[in-house]
């Protein structure tokens, strides 16, 4: 075949392969045009998942009669005129090819009444040349009616999924834009049935209506800025993470994006508090000058490039990481005429005779080195002044003034040697003592290593253990580096090692188990990588071995010491594996269980 110039229709059909891969993509382009036109109310009607019909009506400024044909012409746009405009584009659309691409693979009717016009005008195209415009009746704004998607490209139509799947993609498109534009009312109708009605409202209310009550209940508000860069929105506490990524929404200057850099920054921010098989949920809005971000990467405009990608990554990571690190206070108590102040009781278990091997000595290293004390470089958010008062002291009688009670309250006792039960101002607190202590030890190890001052506890008698010759050979050149994290080892033979000292924070752990854990990590990753790239993973492993074990009986003073440590520890709401360390059971929830007040 000889070289020839393609027809405009074929060119548009080829371009449609990138811009309009499914009905949801066409819907996205039309909705963005409505938002760019200043619409305050948008109505969407779908038939057969958008394959049979997509109809979008808005109350925007409308299109003048003499520009209707241009709106359906390739590379015709009102958004930009020069390269300088492209570099500072603030509108959602700007390429001028979406409507032309849609019109090349579907039957399109465009009806619009421009502000100040006596009546509306309409123009239509059936996958070929434009038809002349004619008068029409409608109020101010624009209606775009798309029918028979891919009617003239049957090969493309075969790649579409079921009606339910295509509708789900369309509905998700509407919800995403509704999140970014809460000041705009949206309605969605599918096959004649209303599916979504959102009035113009505040951003928080829109998030609740779109993402649901579970998201709202576990959401933490984000508001951070650095120069011209700003981050706002909500991230969800790790305890509400799921295996799905469906609840991850990021908008840059009002545009929904799927950016690997942003996803990586947020994943890293959650890494220390989230199980590796779960995914965080968030709805975040990034704002920065238009010239600092390139949105002209792909015709679909969901991929972007930042001028200072490293700076954006660091900003997002630190903003979310600091937020997740702050101790989370218990939920606010119920208010209203039925609410009643809590009555605090003296815990009785303090008088019981308990068999505790180490008593308070187990927590002595923690009292001597609390997180953040004397460490100006590492900021530890404080739970409250009351929460840190008298941390090392014995339990006292609960005051009638709930404001004097620490956030996690005071211990009442233990359940099956696994859970600590405590009473605070809001009701009952249940603590997984191993998971909670594991986080406390982990954070203290990180703080000590950051200071390059991990205190070591020498063993009275060195402990010898056999090891694989390859493991022994691997650690031989790195004994000094291991000493930096509190381990003093000596090689006694090609297949044996003597443990002479362990980190003092882990002095109650089994030195053989600790050393074998170290050797296993070294065998898999090597010492250099382990201490550089996987430092936190190593410390998490050590903390797990060093934490108080389940089924060990604690005294009330020990339980209270653990509660105070949790209140002063970053990320105390999750263990090193992302599991929750404590739950709050409010008094009104207990009343509901026993049907009190009914």
From Swiss-Prot:
The organism's taxonomic lineage, starting at the top: Bacteria, Pseudomonadati, Pseudomonadota, Betaproteobacteria, Nitrosomonadales
| SUPFAM superfamilies associated with the record | ATPase domain of HSP90 chaperone/DNA topoisomerase II/histidine kinase, DNA mismatch repair protein MutL, Ribosomal protein S5 domain 2-like
PANTHER family hit by this protein: DNA MISMATCH REPAIR PROTEIN MLH, PMS, MUTL, DNA MISMATCH REPAIR PROTEIN MLH1
Q: Which HAMAP family does this one have?
A: DNA_mis_repair
Q: What does this protein do?
A: This protein is involved in the repair of mismatches in DNA. It is required for dam-dependent methyl-directed DNA mismatch repair. May act as a 'molecular matchmaker', a protein that promotes the formation of a stable complex between two or more DNA-binding proteins in an ATP-dependent manner without itself being part of a final effector complex.
| Gene3D superfamilies (alphabetical) | 3.30.230.10, Histidine kinase-like ATPase, C-terminal domain (3.30.565.10), MutL, C-terminal domain, dimerisation subdomain (3.30.1540.20), MutL, C-terminal domain, regulatory subdomain (3.30.1370.100)
* Gene Ontology MF annotations: ATP binding; ATP hydrolysis activity; ATP-dependent DNA damage sensor activity; mismatched DNA binding
Cellular component annotations (GO), alphabetically ordered: mismatch repair complex
Q: What are the alphabetically sorted keywords of the record?
A: DNA damage, DNA repair
Name of encoding gene: mutL
Q: What is the species of this protein?
A: Thiobacillus denitrificans (strain ATCC 25259 / T1)
Query: According to its UniProt record, which protein family does this protein belong to?
Result: Belongs to the DNA mismatch repair MutL/HexB family.
Entry's InterPro entries? DNA_mismatch_repair_CS, DNA_mismatch_repair_MutL, DNA_mismatch_S5_2-like, HATPase_C_sf, MutL/Mlh/PMS, MutL/Mlh/Pms-like, MutL_C, MutL_C_dimsub
The record's Gene Ontology biological-process terms are:
mismatch repair
Q: Report what the protein is called.
A: DNA mismatch repair protein MutL
UniProt keyword annotation of Cell wall biogenesis/degradation present: no
Alphabetical list of Pfam families matching this protein: DNA_mis_repair, HATPase_c_3, MutL_C
């Amino acid at each position: 075949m000889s070289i020839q110039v393609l027809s405009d229709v074929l060119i548009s059909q080829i371009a449609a392969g990138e811009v309009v891969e499914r009905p949801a993509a066409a819907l996205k382009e039309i909705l963005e045009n409505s938002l760019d036109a200043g619409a305050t109310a948008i109505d969407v009607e779908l038939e057969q998942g958008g394959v049979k019909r997509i109809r979008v009506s808005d109350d925007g400024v409308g299109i003048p009669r003499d520009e209707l044909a241009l709106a359906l012409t390739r590379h015709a746009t009102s958004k930009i005129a020069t390269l300088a405009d492209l570099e500072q584009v603030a509108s959602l659309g700007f390429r001028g090819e979406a409507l032309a691409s849609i019109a090349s693979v579907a039957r399109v009717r465009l009806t619009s009444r421009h502000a100040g016009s006596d009546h509306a005008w309409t123009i239509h195209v059936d996958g070929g040349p434009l038809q002349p415009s004619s008068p029409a009746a409608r109020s101010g704004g624009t209606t775009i009616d798309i029918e028979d998607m891919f009617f003239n490209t049957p090969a493309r139509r075969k790649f579409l999924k079921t009606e339910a799947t295509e509708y789900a993609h369309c509905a998700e498109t509407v919800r995403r834009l509704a999140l970014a534009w809460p000041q705009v009312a949206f309605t969605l109708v599918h096959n004649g049935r209303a599916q979504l009605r959102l009035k113009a409202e505040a951003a928080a209310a829109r998030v609740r209506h779109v993402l649901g009550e579970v998201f709202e209940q576990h959401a933490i508000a984000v508001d951070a800025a650095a120069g011209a860069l700003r981050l706002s929105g909500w991230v969800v506490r790790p305890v509400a993470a799921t295996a799905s990524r469906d609840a991850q929404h990021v908008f840059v200057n009002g545009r929904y994006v799927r950016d690997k850099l942003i996803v990586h920054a947020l994943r890293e921010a959650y890494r220390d508090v989230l199980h590796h098989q779960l995914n965080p949920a968030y709805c975040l809005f990034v704002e920065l000058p238009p010239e600092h971000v390139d949105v002209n990467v792909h015709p679909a405009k969901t991929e972007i490039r930042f001028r200072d990608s490293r700076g954006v990554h660091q900003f997002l990571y630190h903003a979310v990481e600091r937020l997740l690190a702050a101790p989370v206070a218990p939920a606010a108590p119920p208010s209203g005429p039925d609410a009643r102040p809590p009555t605090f009781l003296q815990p009785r278990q303090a008088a019981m005779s308990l068999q505790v091997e180490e008593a308070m000595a187990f927590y002595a290293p923690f009292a001597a080195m609390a997180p953040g004390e004397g460490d100006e470089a590492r900021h530890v958010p404080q739970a409250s002044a009351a929460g840190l008062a008298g941390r090392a002291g014995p339990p006292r009688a609960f005051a009638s003034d709930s404001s004097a009670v620490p956030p996690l309250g005071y211990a009442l006792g233990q359940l099956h040697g696994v859970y600590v039960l405590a009473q605070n101002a809001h009701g009952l607190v249940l603590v997984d003592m191993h998971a909670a202590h594991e986080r406390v030890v982990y954070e203290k190890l990180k703080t000590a290593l950051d200071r390059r001052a991990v205190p070591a506890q020498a063993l009275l008698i060195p402990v010898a253990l056999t090891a694989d010759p390859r493991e022994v050979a691997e650690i031989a050149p790195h004994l000094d580096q291991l000493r930096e994290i509190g381990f003093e080892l000596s090689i006694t033979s090609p297949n044996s090692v003597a443990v002479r000292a362990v980190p003092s924070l882990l002095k109650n752990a089994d030195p053989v188990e600790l050393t074998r854990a170290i050797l296993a990590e070294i065998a898999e990753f090597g010492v250099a990588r382990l201490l550089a790239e996987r430092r936190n993973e190593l410390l998490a492993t050590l903390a797990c071995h060093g934490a108080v074990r389940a089924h060990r009986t604690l005294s009330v003073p020990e339980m209270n010491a653990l509660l105070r440590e949790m209140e002063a520890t970053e990320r105390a709401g999750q263990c090193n594996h992302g599991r929750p360390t404590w739950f709050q059971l409010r008094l009104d929830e207990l009343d509901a269980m026993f049907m009190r007040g009914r």
